[in-house]
């Protein structure tokens, strides 16, 4: 080591690096700003069209017809709140502490904030401290805990020229190191930057509705102008009436009702899951989970409890019985600085008086797979993997491994401990085997079996030994436990090729976890990922839906879609049920909403076509006004579908939501179109007044809508019958109330119009039943 490194950087060198921007000051921010979120949810084509219609209605002072705009505002507000919450969630993510760093500059040791470090700074790190920046060891020795970053539960030995990763911790020892990377180039910074990418909202229902809105958005302006000019110039209606009638057609084409119900249903699902101790941090993830067909599990904390415990201690020599073994382990763990889960389990089991003072200690290393300690009056005690310490295989160790346990051997030597060149001594004697077990979660087997029955594929992705993971998976009832691979021994290309067919992935790095998820998504799967460590973050962010345990690392909780507050994997099916309930029920009642979209479009086309025929008596003006549609919606699209979305429905989600819903809505929409054409022509031939025609059409429109409500309520139950009675009764009560009649611009069915209504509804009911049965068969 040269003098410059011992002295550290000079103030001049520090200023030069600061001027060059080589400073450890980096904040990983989300890619989406608050303004971008607001803009994305407010300044949309859908909102712009509704706003333009609202302005037109306000301009002609048609105040009673502006009720619809409250729905638009609520939709935009819900979208903003949902995305802001997701942004806030990832903004909080931070893998680094803010503790002062001992830094050598101009030969003096000073305490600096991590963000004040520059490239080339010499820093001194001791046990228990976090590494503030990627650095190379200049002198000293340390055991580093990289579990938070890499998933490796064992400590990693770092000697001269070893690379220290930012975000990891020194478990033992002390080192003098030189900053190798700063700011965005640091390992932890790159990890945070990837994790802080705000994923776009993934809702197939909303995307389907956006497609529909996109289509209507392209035609709505020319349609609106044509309808307005037709009513104003050709039919000679007043400006207010022309605007109101034209607006009704345009509003009917925009699917705002089902968009509102979707958001409301998801919000209720969030509340229900919250009552069941499941925190939903991203509303649309409920829908996504309902569509999941590939669930990737982390072994620790998911299938197992994540709580290591000593299952058994098996003495291997008559010289040292169980009491002697316990005394040695008690002394060893009392002096040991090892903090990995296995050491903690042994320490918890063996407590008491320390019989042997410590002379020297060599911490456990994941490279060596063993640790050692020289104890006064005993010798050098070794604790580690049997295959690394013993020359021959111990049958009992193999049996324990096949049971899914971690096995350690306690051994003794009389040779002195060499810290500079640690190696296995020639006179080593095995004293005992320790079987360490991470218990299977109660109910895990039933949960896995149920998920399989629901057509959900399962994969286990773990940083542990694949043989151990396979054994644990077998005990948990995992069907494909025999299909596993050691990811530390294959390339990325090989991993991508094996991702679809392999069930268990062991020794997986954070990058490989993400790659597995990406490969599965490219294969067409909707993926969910469970995890609890920082090493899972990249995969959790990549998955369509991320689920973490509340007992997991705080960083994973901050970026997860769902957090299991009870840290119980067995809650996953309940979340699946809730998602399927929402998605299936929305698909079930969607035709009720799409009837209006279809008939509004068809009637608008007919109205425009009628103006091109050249005869004034054939010109058709859109027959409804916004307040009429709004009132009918209360009893057709409002309360009944809302109540029906709460019913249990856990069948697998069907594809092609929009296409199937449109086909189911088409017969009813055609009935409305036929009603308008027939009543207009027949009424004119019979000399009916516009009020009589408007009244009959109002009743027909409401009644055709009720046919779809009846279908949605089948098979009938007491509550569903009461729902139908409330809807039909509410519709009739408002239609017969004089004040409301005036507002709706209708009256009561007369002796001339009532029989026509009865005959038409009888025919429509028969047609509706026949078409519904035909569609059900298909």
From Swiss-Prot:
InterPro entries: ATPase_P-typ_cyto_dom_N, ATPase_P-typ_P_site, ATPase_P-typ_TM_dom_sf, ATPase_P-typ_transduc_dom_A_sf, HAD-like_sf, HAD_sf, P_typ_ATPase, P_typ_ATPase_HD_dom. Its EC number is 7.2.2.-. It is found in: Cell membrane. One of its GO terms (molecular function) is ATP hydrolysis activity. Its main location: membrane. SUPFAM superfamilies: Calcium ATPase, transduction domain A, Calcium ATPase, transmembrane domain M, HAD-like, Metal cation-transporting ATPase, ATP-binding domain N. Residues 1-37, 85-209, 261-586, 646-663, 709-716, 778 are cytoplasmic. Belongs to the cation transport ATPase (P-type) (TC 3.A.3) family. This is Probable cation-transporting ATPase exp7. The lineage of its organism: Bacteria, Bacillati, Bacillota, Bacilli, Lactobacillales. The gene is exp7.
